[in-house]
Amino acid sequence: MTNAPLANPPLQDFIGRHENLFVLTGAGCSTNSGIPDYRDGHGNWKRTQPVNFQAFMSEEHTRQRYWARSLIGWRRFGQARPNDAHHALARLEANGQCGMLLTQNVDRLHQSAGHRQVIDLHGRLDLVRCMGCGRKTPRNEFQDALGRANAEWLTLDAADAPDGDADLEHADFSSFKVPACEACGGILKPDVVFFGENVPRDVVATAHDHLAQADAMLIVGSSLMVYSGFRFVQAAAKRQIPIAAVNLGRTRADDLLTLKVEERCEAALAFLL
């Protein structure tokens, strides 16, 4: 593996030599848009682990805590805008070099930047899904419903946490009211893949189909500590196609990389703009 210096002719050369890149992005791609990431440069958790799927579905107090924090966090998360890293990757697609972008992020900022071929591996936070009937509601609409039911919480503020969460510590969530599905009364959950929940098989299969056509893989802003993303790097390595990564700190795939650039995503990709 080659470690590139801060000025990145090796990365520019890598991208220039390939016509059908499969791009995988993670939280580091969106930190400059004001969305915190989960892990430090060693791949360790910066905070307690995110909410678990089984706990969310089985425990009312877990749902109260999640949605109370989300009520506060969504106000800024929902206003996040693409940064230069998103725009650079959209330019890569416009240049005809990115066949598919697979993102582990749930912020839809790649789409906002104009990227067309995007797979949201872990879903999208701008939708809320009923776990009973499957009905989907725009998150902004559900935000209004949460606010109407919990007006006293609207005056609170807290530091941002990853994926629209807020560090609302030491609060009593027992009085927080979580609306049920208007159609069937079912449990409402953000349309994202929680920890302990499986990525839909059709999403995984579609991503693998596109990876099978790629002539190289580019990882941007991910430590790959979560297997749902790491497995695609394993598949690329099995095909023996070149793999480059832009990430601050270690990744789970360091021994599989052809090239690694330890630099902020927007800086490393600036030559594309």
Kindly give the residue locations of the regions a language model identified:
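Conserved catalytic core of sirtuin-type NAD+-dependent deacylases
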Residues: 1-273
